[in-house]
Design a protein with these regions (language model features):
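C-terminal effector/catalytic modules and regulatory tails appended to multi-domain proteins
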Residues: 1-22, 26-41, 225-366
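Acidic/His-rich, divalent-metal-binding segments that scaffold phosphate/diphosphate chemistry
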Residues: 2-110, 114-156, 160, 349-366
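Zn2+-dependent metallopeptidase catalytic core
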Residues: 64-79, 181-184, 188, 312-326
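Divalent metal-dependent catalytic cores for phosphoryl transfer on phosphate-bearing substrates
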Residues: 83-286
């Protein structure tokens, strides 16, 4: 992990603020929550480590993603807004970062059941129609003149595409599965109780929201500006916006552009495993003037895929700004200061970009 050197939740800005950023009664509650989060977040990370999601060579999420999303949350929230969040809001953000993608984890019985699901068979057939390169690989594998090395390479590529297809299927319901997991696993866990209220339901709603339109973060869908937990008021709309943007800013790996899948065939130098490496961000600049990335892209297809991510981030930035702009007057402290869309790198940086391109590193702005 080249940029955010995070080994545990204790290294994140949000947890440090929860642990040490309060006084009086708030400090007592905050420190209890911070202590509870150590074990809870470790459980979330262990679950990601223990179950390679879809294929041992293509694990969809890992504990690194959870920690990075947690830290990116602190980067997208203005610093004075962050220090003004109450202990429950900080806790909800940390928990949602750690549980929003738990639905991508398939345990063995679930995977076996899914493979026999008629809906999955239909999905697979349609996916192969839309991705003729997969069918072409199958035909090539039937060639008896192939060398063993060539056959092994084709099998590897086929496995990558099969994992991508399965990922696409699971992705459709992973937010609901994440919410269900939180409710079932932690709905009666006393570590999740604050002032007599178990906050698993609030975390479940946030998990569910991150895969839906940002404009569904509305009171009628369970997202209020003044959700009450004991004497604390929680802005669930703001928490939902922060989660979804931090998630995609980690180049969330279940959002690999479909166009990249279509480029993979038996002659291609494109590999999903290689894309996984290149997807890793080498540097961020995130402030009110600029959201800028530096990624390592050694193939035009990886650059094209990365630029698609920039387009997604632009849409999320615009949606978030629009929603926050409509907050009631009493909630104006929850500001959003990130730029609305991509901005060009200044001229000197553009010259640097050309130099970096020659060495295989591409800065992107989004």
């Amino acid at each position: 992990m080249p940029v955010l050197h995070l080994k545990s939740i204790e290294d994140t800005t949000l947890w440090k603020q929860l642990k040490s950023g309060f006084t009086g009664d708030d400090a007592n509650i905050a420190q209890t929550l911070a202590s509870n989060l150590l074990g809870i977040c470790e459980e979330a990370q262990d679950r990601m480590r223990a179950f390679p999601t879809l294929h041992p060579q293509y694990t969809l999420h890992d504990e690194t993603h959870l920690l990075r999303v947690t830290e990116l949350m602190a980067m997208v929230i203005p610093s004075d807004v962050l220090t003004g969040l109450n202990p429950i809001e900080l806790t909800l953000l940390i928990l949602s970062a750690h549980f929003h993608d738990q639905g991508m984890v398939l345990e063995k019985p679930e995977l076996d059941a899914l493979l026999n699901d008629p809906n999955f068979r239909i999905f697979r057939e349609n996916w192969e129609i839309e991705h003729p390169n997969r069918r072409e690989l199958r035909n090539r594998l039937s060639d008896k003149t192939l060398t063993e090395d060539a056959r092994d390479n084709l099998r590897r590529i086929a496995c990558e595409l099969d994992a991508a297809m399965l990922t696409d299927f699971v992705r459709q319901t992973h937010a609901e599965r994440s919410a269900e997991y939180v409710r079932a696993r932690y709905g009666s866990d006393p570590r999740w109780n604050v002032a007599g209220v178990n906050i698993a339901e609030l975390v479940a709603r946030l998990c569910l929201s991150h895969f839906e339109s940002a404009h569904k973060l509305r009171p009628e869908n369970g997202f209020r500006f003044d959700e009450c937990v004991g004497t604390y008021r929680i802005n669930m709309v703001y928490a939902g916006l922060v989660l979804r943007l931090a998630d995609i800013m980690d180049f969330d790996r279940d959002r690999t552009p479909d166009a990249l899948y279509r480029t993979i065939d038996f002659t291609s130098r494109i590999s999903l495993r290689e894309w996984e490496k290149h997807r890793s961000v080498q540097g961020w600049v995130i402030n009110r003037q600029l959201v800028q990335y530096t990624l390592r892209c050694e193939h035009p297809e990886y650059e094209r895929a990365a630029r698609e991510f920039m387009d997604w981030i632009d849409r999320e930035l615009a949606d978030a700004a629009d929603i926050v702009r409509q907050f009631p007057a009493g909630f104006s402290k929850y500001r959003w200061e990130l730029p609305l869309k991509s901005r060009p790198v200044p001229h000197r940086a553009e010259e640097q970009r050309l130099r970096l391109q020659r060495s295989g590193v591409y800065p992107f702005t989004g």
